Each structure stands twice: as C-alpha cells, then as structure tokens.
C-alpha cells in the first residue's frame, strides 16, 4: 500500500523525459560548424550508396545511442566513426531541441565547432563524401515547405466495444512538415532539414 512518504520517494527527483520512450529508438547527431574563409560553414555528410537505410541521402554525423551511453557520448562517437575526427577537434556548445519523428525515433541534436578538418578521414562504408554550406546562405534562403498527412490505421483486433462510438470512432489525423533546402546540386530534406531549421531559428532577428 502506498502512503504519502512512499509517493514522495517515487516521485522526488524524477527527471521528465518522453512518455513511451522505452518503445522508441534513440539517436544523437552532431551539427558541425566549421570556420572557413572567415565565415562559419555547416558540414554535411552524403551517406554511402551501399547503406541499407537512407542510402545517398544527406545527413549530419550521428547514429543510434548504445546501451549505457549518453546522447552526447553517442554523438561524439558516431562523428569519430563516420568522419574520423579527433575527439579534441569536436567542441560541443549546446544540445538543441529533441526531435520526435513519425516513425518513433527520438533524436538528440548537438551543435558545436569542428576544428582541424584536415584530420577528417571518411569511413567510406558509411559516408561517400562531405560538403559545407555557409551559415549565411542557409539564413538567407528559406526552405520549401510541404505537409504529409499522418493517419491512424487502427488494429482490427482493438476492443472497439470499449471505445465510445465503437468502430465509428474518429481517430485524429495529423500533419508532418517536410522541409527542403537546396544548395548547388545538393538537397537537404527530411529529418536533417528539420534539425537544421531548429538550429537556424536561434539566429533569426
């Protein structure tokens, strides 16, 4: 039986996160800022064409968070594994807003400086090449916006008799914004564009 003290013991010092996170996949990414020609650039990867998931797409360094690993540790580890940067060249400034994707990914983005890019040695199994975009260009060129419909398709084994309206119950649909940035022959879209947009919002007047 729970009394007042037991309730306090369970709830005190609880750190809120995301309800249902235990059923979601977790990942972390690093937004690398590079100083080049007196201007800040953002470094992007073009994923290898041989990858099973999202081949040839543009992304930030990053990947899944392993057991016992913090999101920050995962972002740094994945950056080292993918582009070969030295740990001391990765200077994290801040964590940005969490991104929850429609397919139940929790993504922890971090932003910081990547120094000494001459140390980069790409893991060609994962990364075809990298390129950089001036921060000023991204701030001056707004993305194109589109909206996908996210629809609930209920399991036919649901106990509809327990739901008001039963099989006539109207499940809500939602909208998921899809952003597209173009730079030269590159198209930055999807998850990467959403994370980028959140980062760029910090520099709006």
Predicted regions and their residues:
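N-terminal leader/linker segments that precede catalytic domains of diphosphate-processing enzymes
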Residues: 1-59, 63-109, 113-114, 136, ...
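Acidic, glycine-rich loop-and-strand cores that form catalytic or ligand-binding grooves
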Residues: 120-157
